[in-house]
Design a protein with these regions (language model features):
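Basic/polar N-terminal segments that are highly enriched at the extreme N-terminus
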Residues: 1-5
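A non-catalytic, amphipathic alpha-helix used as a structural packing/dimerization or gating element
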Residues: 6-17, 81-85, 89
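Short, contiguous alpha-helical
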Residues: 8-20, 24-69, 111-157
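Helix-adjacent hinge/juxtasegments
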Residues: 62-100
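Acidic catalytic patch
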Residues: 96-111
Length: 157
């Protein structure tokens, strides 16, 4: 069975590949409204970072996530800096977990306003799948632009 830590390491590696591919586009192409979930490639990419950042705050009982709006990211360097911040936060959180820490339980309200009990691992799997879903969207947008997306297979399959 694959441990959630490996999934998050995979996501980080692939996230960097996709960022590097998108950074080859012009800034105008990156921020163009493409009528997708969060409109532009920039916004979709930042949304996935923001989701991870938000849930890390939840898990750490912190308020460290970026408060910047999509349009406040004005160049690739700013997006890359945010990506690297989320990478470090994720690694630091995982490294700080005690034995059994992934099993820590939380009670919260979901988007359907239902009270649910979940574990830290459940939250991290949600973070993983949120990024994977939006990566599919980014892939489709790149294809529409005539850009071949980077390889993303698990274990480089």
């Amino acid at each position: 069975m694959v441990e959630v830590r490996r999934l998050l390491e995979y996501n980080e590696k692939i996230r960097h590949r996709y960022f590097e591919a998108m950074a080859k586009l012009s800034w105008e192409e990156f921020i163009m409204n493409r009528e997708a979930s969060f409109h532009s490639l920039r916004n979709i990419f930042i949304h996935t970072l923001g989701a991870a950042d938000y849930w890390l705050d939840f898990l750490q009982k912190a308020d460290c996530h970026s408060k910047k709006k999509f349009d406040e990211y004005k160049n690739f360097d700013e997006v890359k800096a945010y990506m690297e911040t989320v990478d470090v936060r994720t690694r630091n959180y995982l490294d700080s977990l005690p034995a059994g820490g992934l099993g820590k339980k939380y009670t919260l309200k979901n988007d359907a306003d239902e009270t649910i009990e979940i574990t830290a691992e459940d939250i991290l799997i949600h973070v993983f799948e949120e990024e994977v879903h939006h990566r599919g969207e980014i892939i489709a947008l790149l294809w529409q632009m005539g850009v071949e997306p980077p390889l993303m297979g698990w274990k480089d399959l």
